[in-house]
From Swiss-Prot:
The lineage of its organism: Bacteria, Pseudomonadati, Pseudomonadota, Alphaproteobacteria, Hyphomicrobiales. This is HTH-type transcriptional regulator SmoD. The keyword Cytoplasm applies. It comes from Agrobacterium fabrum (strain C58 / ATCC 33970). Keywords: Cytoplasm, DNA-binding, Transcription, Transcription regulation. The keyword Metal-binding does not apply. It holds the Pfam family GntR.
């Protein structure tokens, strides 16, 4: 079953897109943004929506609004992005991530996964990730079954970690990524640019909860002709 519910509000999507543009260096510290009406027209949104986005950035310390002059970018080390753990960007940098849920099921944990959690079962979540609308990656995520009995697709957010935090009181505080090459799985949708069996970059992630326990393990296969894995050291 495919599902795209749980999208962030439009003003938040724009705010997150701008955060990623700053992180990628496409918007730099001190840069003056275009006038609000021009910027809203370029983004295809209402001026009121843009102003909510800019207010969100100002609250996070990423924007300075100078009366009579305009809006200026202020780069900070922690922009508090809901996508702070999402490491894929377009080859040219940045891009707003979105998620399409392909399947959710509670199953026995596969033997080939690293040991994690206290339950013998986990919630397997398969998703297609797009960046700026381009199919870029597929994910198979396993959340330990002890955190919740059932996951309902309709209640999920495009930001899975935001869903964990707001619905399950689970905070992902740290993550370890291990990158290698792997074959695209058979369940990959046709819209993903690499065929099943093709060798692509693959990321194994072990995600820790606020108590230090590994709560989630995931695999991500990404299309290297669309995206890059980016880790910035500050």
């Amino acid at each position: 079953m495919k599902h795209t519910g749980g999208s962030l509000p439009m003003y938040m999507q724009i705010a997150e897109m701008l955060v990623r543009e700053v992180a990628a260096g496409r918007l730099i510290d001190g840069e003056k943004l275009a006038p609000e009406r021009d910027m809203a027209a370029d983004l295809g949104i209402a001026v009121g929506t843009l102003r909510k986005s800019l207010a969100e950035l100002q609250e996070r310390g990423l924007l300075e609004r100078v009366q009579g002059s305009g809006n200026y970018i202020r780069a900070v080390s922690d922009p508090q992005s809901v996508y702070a753990f999402f490491r894929l960007e377009l080859i040219e940098g940045g891009g707003l991530p979105t998620a399409e849920v392909l399947d959710v099921a509670r199953l026995a944990k596969p033997a080939d996964l690293p040991a994690f959690g206290t339950s013998t079962e986990g919630h397997r979540i398969r998703r297609l990730r797009r960046i700026a609308g381009k199919p870029a990656a597929i994910e198979e995520i396993w959340l330990d079954g002890s955190y919740v009995d059932t996951i309902t697709i309709e209640n999920m957010s495009e930001s899975l970690y935001l869903y964990y935090r707001t619905r399950l009181n689970l905070w992902i505080s740290k993550a370890e990524d291990r990158i290698d090459l792997g074959d695209v799985p058979e369940w990959a949708p046709e819209v993903f640019g690499q065929k099943a069996g093709s060798s692509v970059p693959r990321v194994l992630r072990l995600s820790q909860a606020q108590d230090g326990a590994v709560a989630e393990v995931s695999w991500t296969w990404f299309d290297h002709t669309v995206a890059r894995y980016v880790s910035r050291i500050r």
